[in-house]
Amino acid sequence: MPGITFRAVSKRFGNSGTLALQDVTFEVPQGSTCMLVGRSGAGKTTLLRMVNRLIEPTSGTILVSGRSVLDEDPIELRRHIGYVIQQVGLFPHMNVAENIRVTAEVAGGWSRSKLDARVDELLHLVGLPPAEYRRRFPRELSGGQQQRVGLARALMTDPAILLMDEPFGALDAITRGQMQDELLRIQRDVKKTVLFVTHDIEEALKLGNLVAVMHHGKLLQLGAPADLLTRPTDQTVARLVGSDDVLRELRFLTASCAEDASYTGAPQDAGPLPRCAPDATLLDAMLSLFRTRAPALVLEAADGLPARHVTLESIISTLQKGAP
């Protein structure tokens, strides 16, 4: 079942009827991360806020776990959807533990021992040792630490859906990269359905299973990062994702995109070939070929499956022609 479904969603604002979204239709699979990317005014945040009914659609249908959000009580709906924003929104008069558990306290039905155990579990999850951080106040935290607390608060009630509106946009480049890595790690553990707004195409390519490219309220393309880089639907998408940027392709396309089906094998005296994870980047694969001077890399596969290979020639071909 899709985690989130948009069907012909449109939105007009004000008496002038300004069209912010026009006939947007797509699905976000359960447990996946979908990045909404586009320039300012593309409709990304408007679309995201419709999921928890902070904004109502003018027309169309939005389903969460198969149920229309318009059939749900807005307050009850929001209690089951995590929400993380750029400004974090921590209460300055509350310590870290109080900030995290506030959503569960509002929902009710949690004992104090259960609240405390869940807070400690989430602090461990976001990389903040509870003994050191649970009694600190927001003013005593760095920007990155505040965002970790904000993420922990959004996960407090274990929601199936997580909405993230440019959560790392105000962080410096180093902290931003660290938070992106942390989110990838956390998502591998919790497997939430994530809808994430960003202006940063590299952030979108790094974090997303799917990337939805928005432009002037329309959905231009929905696809995996490799699809956008190698098969953009039009020039607007191509310019936005930088589909002619070879360095970007090396960093974000995976080795599995560059399988060399014509490789016949190394000479018997060449020794065993080095191995490569299918999700390693093309850059990692290319550097491994240079370091080892091997004629090919073996793509790791489950037992019993035939060996697949990546060569320097297949990497170059992929960059020139696009992933198969």
Where on the chain are the PLM-derived regions?
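ABC ATPase "signature
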Residues: L222-G223, R231, H309
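Helix-to-loop junction immediately C-terminal to a conserved catalytic motif
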Residues: N52
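Short helical segment in ABC ATPase nucleotide-binding domains corresponding to the A-loop/adjacent helical element
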Residues: A97-V106, D116, D120
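ABC ATPase NBD coupling module
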Residues: S68-G82, V106, R112-S113, R231-P232
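A short, proline-enriched helix->beta-strand linker immediately N-terminal to the Walker B motif
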Residues: M156-A160
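Conserved ABC ATPase "signature" region
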Residues: S113-E132
